[in-house]
Every structure is written in C-alpha cells, then in structure tokens.
Amino acid sequence: MRGNYLSLLVVLIVLASNDVLANNNSSTPKLRRSDFPEDFIFGSATSAYQVEGGAHEDGRGPSIWDTFSEKYPEKIKDGSNGSVADNSYHLYKEDVALLHQIGFNAYRFSISWSRILPRGNLKGGINQAGIDYYNNLINELLSKGIKPFATMFHWDTPQALEDAYGGFRGAEIVNDFRDYADICFKNFGDRVKHWMTLNEPLTVVQQGYVAGVMAPGRCSKFTNPNCTDGNGATEPYIVGHNLILSHGAAVQVYREKYKASQQGQVGIALNAGWNLPYTESPKDRLAAARAMAFTFDYFMEPLVTGKYPVDMVNNVKGRLPIFTAQQSKMLKGSYDFIGINYYSSTYAKDVPCSTKDVTMFSDPCASVTGERDGVPIGPKAASDWLLIYPKGIRDLVLYAKYKFKDPVMYITENGRDEFSTNKIFLKDGDRIDYYARHLEMVQDAISVGANVKGFFAWSLLDNFEWAMGYTVRFGLVYVDFKDGCKRYPKKSAEWFRKLLNEKKND
C-alpha cells in the first residue's frame, strides 16, 4: 500500500513541477488553430436521450430514463423528460449542417440501445428503423467531411433488461451488451472508426445507485428516502463491475471479429475532476490520492492492469467484486484510446473512515468539497457542482499520462452551462472564456508530452440535462423548445468557427 501512495506522490510532484498558473481574472486567452497539431480533431458532442426525441416512435423500446423521467416527473427539476428533447431524430440534418458551418471535423453522438434492440437483447428482435436512423446520421456526417465518434452506452439502459434482471445489477447484462455492441460494429463499423463503449460509468454508479438522483434512482434509504430501493454500500460496486466487464466484452468482440477488416479503434469515456489536497499535509495529499482512486482510477486501473486500485481493495474489502483470472486477462489493455470528460475540480480532505451509514461516497475516507476556507476553487457556472478550474484539465491529462502508460487521449466532453431564461440568449461570453482557458491548458499538456488527439465541446445543442431537465443550457447552439426546437448559434459557436478558420479571437 505504501508503494502505491509513493508512486502517486511522484505523479503529483511531476505535475507540480510542470505547473502553470490559470488566472481566472486575466483576459480571455487568444488561441489559433495552429497552436494545436495539424491532425488534432475539434468536434462537439451530444447523447441520444438528451437530443434525439422520438422516444416512442419507429419501434424504439423504453429505457430507464424514459421510465425515470416520465413515471416520476418530480425527480426532474422542471418535471420534464426527453421524449421530444431537441427532436434530432427528425432534425439530424440540421445538426450536421451546424457542425459543418462551425467547422468541426468530428461529432460524438451516442446510439440508443433500445432503438436498436427494443427489449435490450437479441431475443426481442432488432429494430431496422433504428439501424436506418443511425446509418442516415453517419452518412450525412461523412458527406460533410465530419468523422463519426460513436458511444454505445450513454446511461440509457433498456427498461426491459432492468425489469428482467436489474439491468447492470445483473451479470447477464455483460452478454447482452456484447451482443448489442456486435450489432453496432456489424452495421456501422465500415464507416465508424472511433467507438466508445461507455460514457461516464462513474456517473452511472454514483448518481444512479448511491445518490439516487438519476435513473434508475436507487440508493440507501438513509441517503435519500425518496429512492425506490437500493444499497449504496454494495450495489454501486456490482454495477461498476458489470459495466467494466461489459466494456471488456465489447472490445473483445471487436478485436476478434471486426478489427482486421474495419481497422477502427475502441475506447471508453471516463469522467473525473482533479482532486487537490485541502492542505499540504501528508494526510490530505493521501486523501486526494484516494479520491482519485475511487473516481478516475476506478475504471482506468482495470483496463491497464486487470485489477482494481489498491485503495479500493483496502477500503471496500469484501464488498468489492473480484475479477477472475480470465476476466483480468480480457480487461488488461482493452482500449485503443481513453476519452476524458472534464468540467470541474475539488479539494479532498482526510476524514475518519465511516462505520455507520456506509456508502461508496464514504469509502474513500475523504471529504470532497468545492471550496477551501469558504473560498470556492473557481467561479460557479449555473450548476452548483460546476466550479471553473481550467488547470484541472491539464493536471488530469498529465496524471493519466504518467500513471497509466501514456495513453492516447481525447477530451470527449468539456463545457459549462447557463440558466435557462424566457428569452433567446446568444451572447455567451462566459462560455467562450471557459473554452479558451481549458483549450489553453490542453495545449500546454500537449506541449509537455500528453498524447491528446482531439477535443469535443459539450454540447452542440442545449438539451435535456438529466435531473436538471431544461433549466440549464450547455449548448453552443440555442434551442427554442417552445418553437419547434429551432436552432440559433450562440456567440461561442462563432468563436469556434473563427478559431477553426485560423482567425485570432477578439
């Protein structure tokens, strides 16, 4: 255990030695496209449930998010759902035109599992209308010179599998996900060359099974009495285990059946903030290391070594599932690239380990907070959790480089939100500042050796923002949900257009 801590401290020291200041009070950085490698990819991202709509059309089966938001509207801040969302199911050509107009050369989207397999598995049949929709989207992208980056799971587990065996609580889901991935590779892999198996498995685990504020809304009663059921000390680890194995199974089927002919790459999109020690004390430094172990390392370590982080093994003990030797072999090296979703950072402070009301949140024995001595780590966006700390994206990327064998990386999500208003709001200077500062930090990480190949802005469109509904907006493009989902590019879209056309930003 001591060796593990020492190796992490070496990483932290290296990051500190390469430190650059990110002064939130300075003027917005001026960037050029030529500041980045010639083959660097610039794109934007969305997810199926957040933008598609058409939730009950053309044979699509329900997902757990349909059930969660439609059956329990009180769990969504404005009582809304994604049944229509941005109506991208019908307006996808407009979305592709916007991407082309801005100058992006890649688009990260997710495939709705239940649009392909309405009941989640092969026994329930394949929905050809779903296959046709994604073929049309992919072909439209390619016709405009835009590379498709496809995510196979962005939180929308088919409700039929949740009903059958508890969704990702059941080991059966690994085979069902493998079969679903096989269908995706078979039908789209001749044109899609960049795949992500899962998006933010950490969010699925934490918000769906510990906090209970996202689908399927499970948690311990002492955490949230409104949860329908659950156990925040055990279920998150079971779900995380099956998510990791599902990833491994999908990569395995690609490499065995499709890699030779399709020559694509398969990765995963992981989210994490950077965790700074609350003080410079050794205890708080170790607390920050544990916080990383239970977030980013939780899903990265098994893909590199076939094992869980030592801190998780030591703290969770018998509640943490074990990989068999065969599973470890399957997982080790099961990625061609790593996607990193970064928004914010926090401080971590050492606290005694809990013996009462234990959950995954208490297991790291670290208190995670966005402020120190009453001072926030950075300015707050609309969402309470989104405190702006640009340097964190650099530190996280370099952490991944130094600790996990210098992987190929893409920034697969990065962005900030503003509150929704009754007026069309296009002058999003704060978003421009956010992107400029974070891209500056990404460029700095590249300059010291980080193997970052691309950047995807979250999000192309204002959309259904999960438990927040439509109360906040992350889009480069304003969507008028009251007027047929009309799209209006914001100033940030124009900023990207100028950047990608090699003009100096004012």
From Swiss-Prot:
Entries under InterPro entries matching the protein: Glyco_hydro_1 (IPR001360), Glyco_hydro_1_N_CS (IPR033132), Glycoside_hydrolase_SF (IPR017853)
Q: What is this protein called?
A: Beta-glucosidase 15
Q: What does induction of this protein depend on?
A: Up-regulated during abiotic stress recovery.
Catalyzed reactions: Hydrolysis of terminal, non-reducing beta-D-glucosyl residues with release of beta-D-glucose
Disulfide bond positions:
219-227
Where on this protein are sugars attached? Answer: 24-25, 81, 226
Q: What's the gene?
A: BGLU15
Function as written in the Swiss-Prot or TrEMBL entry: Beta-glucosidase involved in the rapid degradation of flavonol 3-O-beta-glucoside-7-O-alpha-rhamnosides during abiotic stress recovery. No activity with quercetin 3-O-alpha-rhamnoside, quercetin 3-O-beta-galactoside and rutin.
Q: Member of which family?
A: Belongs to the glycosyl hydrolase 1 family.
Q: Which UniProt keywords are given for this protein, alphabetically ordered?
A: Apoplast, Disulfide bond, Glycoprotein, Glycosidase, Hydrolase, Secreted, Signal
- The UniProt annotation places a beta-D-glucoside binding at 50, 154, 199-200, 343, 413, 458, 465-466, 474
pH note: Optimum pH is 5.0.
- Pfam families the record matches: Glyco_hydro_1
List the catalytic residues.
200 (proton donor), 413 (nucleophile)
Its Enzyme Commission number(s) read 3.2.1.21
Organism of this sequence: Arabidopsis thaliana (Mouse-ear cress)
Any GO MF annotation of the entry: beta-glucosidase activity
**GO CC annotation terms, alphabetical:** apoplast; Golgi apparatus; plant-type cell wall; plasmodesma
Q: Which residues form the signal peptide?
A: 1-22
- GO terms of biological process kind: carbohydrate metabolic process; kaempferol O-glucoside metabolic process; quercetin O-glucoside metabolic process
